[in-house]
């Protein structure tokens, strides 16, 4: 039996509303945690229960996220940023950051192309040898080398994903 689609309207029964709030709050905080982990983002969420009790989640913590928000956007709340020119230094910093990230991406692309050329020129001889003829020690050594390569690949993927998230955030 599959899940039913629930209409988006306020739940009338107070007990059901409280249960729904608790479950959805947990899901919201879980998604926020995943976003923070995947994109190396700092984030903060504050929600109030139907009874008026506040719940918060912050990564790394809500205080540091709120402090950073207030520090960076304190001047922009006045609505006079175009007149005062306060947006220009921020825009310049973001533009410089974007340029640096673009340079990193280009460097990584070049590194990837060079690595690809090395792999193609090597002819994948390492992977052609028959593993049936290897001793237990040789197999363990081979396994360790593969795990090392796998770890480096995962690290590079995580670095590129974080850079991509930063680029997307800096464009907004």
UniProtKB/Swiss-Prot annotation:
PANTHER family in alphabetical order: AGAMOUS-LIKE MADS-BOX PROTEIN AGL29, MADS BOX PROTEIN
Coiled coil: 86-123
Protein name stated in the entry: Agamous-like MADS-box protein AGL29
Gene Ontology molecular function terms on file: DNA binding; DNA-binding transcription factor activity; protein dimerization activity
Location of the region described as Disordered in the Swiss-Prot/TrEMBL record: 106-125
Alphabetic keyword roster: Coiled coil, DNA-binding, Nucleus, Transcription, Transcription regulation
Keyword Ligase: no
Tissue: Expressed in pollen.
Stored Gene3D superfamilies: Transcription factor, MADS-box
Primary subcellular site in the record, as a coarse category: nucleus
Entry annotated with the keyword S-adenosyl-L-methionine: no
Gene (name only): AGL29
InterPro entries, sorted: TF_MADSbox, TF_MADSbox_sf
Residue ranges of domain MADS-box in the record: 1-61
GO terms for cellular component: nucleus
Task of the protein: Probable transcription factor.
Cell location: Nucleus
Recorded superkingdom: Eukaryota
């Amino acid at each position: 039996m599959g899940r039913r689609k629930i209409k988006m309207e306020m739940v009338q029964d107070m007990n059901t509303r409280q249960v729904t709030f608790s479950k959805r709050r947990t899901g919201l905080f879980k998604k926020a945690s995943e976003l923070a982990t995947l994109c190396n983002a700092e984030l903060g969420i504050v929600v109030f229960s139907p009874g008026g009790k506040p719940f918060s989640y912050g990564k790394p913590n809500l205080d540091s996220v709120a402090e950073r928000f207030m520090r960076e956007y304190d001047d922009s709340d006045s609505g006079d940023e175009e007149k005062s020119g306060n947006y220009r230094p921020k825009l310049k910093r973001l533009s410089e950051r974007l340029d640096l990230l673009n340079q990193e991406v280009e460097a990584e692309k070049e590194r990837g192309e060079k690595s690809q050329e090395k792999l193609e020129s090597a002819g994948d001889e390492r992977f052609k040898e028959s593993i049936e003829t290897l001793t237990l020690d040789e197999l363990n050594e081979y396994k360790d080398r593969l795990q090392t390569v796998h770890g480096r690949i995962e690290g590079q993927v995580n670095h590129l994903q974080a850079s991509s998230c930063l680029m997307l955030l800096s464009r907004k």
